[in-house]
Amino acid sequence: IYEPEIA
């Protein structure tokens, strides 16, 4: 699952 606000 990719999280757009992980950085």
Swiss-Prot record:
Organism phylogeny: Eukaryota, Metazoa, Chordata, Craniata, Vertebrata
Tissues of expression: Expressed by the skin glands.
Coiled-coil region(s): none
GO cellular component terms given for this protein: extracellular region
Residues the record lists as Alanine amide modifications: 7
Subcellular location: Secreted
GO biological process: defense response
Name of the protein in question: Electrin-5
Cytoplasm among keywords: no
Protein keywords: Amidation, Amphibian defense peptide, Secreted
